[in-house]
Amino acid sequence: MDGKQTLEQLSQKHKVSVRTVQRKLEKVGSSNLEISGKSIVIMVDAAYWGRSFGVMVFKDAYSKSVVWYKFIYRKERIIDYMEGIDYLVKNGCTIRGIVCDGMPGLIRALSCFNVQYCQFHMVKTVHSKLTKHPKSEAGKELLAISNLIAHTDKESFVGMLDQWYDVYGHYMNERSVPDQSGHTHYMHKRLRGAYLSLRRNTDYLWTWYDNIVLDIPNTNNGIESLFADLNSKLRVHNGLSLKNREKFISQYLKRKQ
């Protein structure tokens, strides 16, 4: 499927009916990609169309090729990622590093590898908690620190977080007046969540630098651009059924092998 061509355009180009084009699409298989043993650094992520259909993709940062994918029909799970890892290992691949987002428990599950937390996703997580325009000075300064992740080193970043906590730690940990049951809650939950997320994942934000000879990307931009291109092609094929959409995506990803 070259460029942005609708079913009608494809039928006109090849002088066949739209139904014939659809049948051709249905013949495209959906199977694991054939790979041979090699050293790889994989960028892993999933894209969704609606709440109950998506595809998980592993892309090698060295060769820029897709090395594994899987369709999913509910929210992604750690076991899905481990299935892909197992497939690559069994096919003789040596995984030098993994770039991923902050799915709860995923980094721990992959801890036997060099795991790089996507710096872009980290900043995005902080933005989602603080918004782009926090009202408090604590929020403004923490947001500014998070925006420096891709422009500073680990030691400087940890130093900035420590200084921020020295100034705003008490404010961040303020609790409410006890209710009738004696329970209290944190007054600044989103600020606290943003800080703890940064602190908890600091060790994985500079894996690329700690293992610089492995040439691990610091973000998942390589796989995000693949999803953006795939989406642009799918938008002009809105008439595809779920089955044919899977066939289309399979063909697209196999061409990226």
PLM ranges: what are they?
Residues 1-5:
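Short, amphipathic alpha-helical "recognition" segments used to contact nucleic acids or chromatin
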Residues 6, 17-20:
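Short coil turns linking two alpha-helices in DNA-binding domains
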Residues 7-12:
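Residues within the helices of the helix-turn-helix
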Residues 13, 20-99, 104, 108, ...:
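RNase H-like nuclease fold core
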Residues 93-103, 110, 143-257:
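Acidic/histidine-rich catalytic cores and adjacent linkers
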Residues 97-143:
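Conserved beta-strand -> loop -> alpha-helix junction used to position metal-binding or nucleic-acid-contacting
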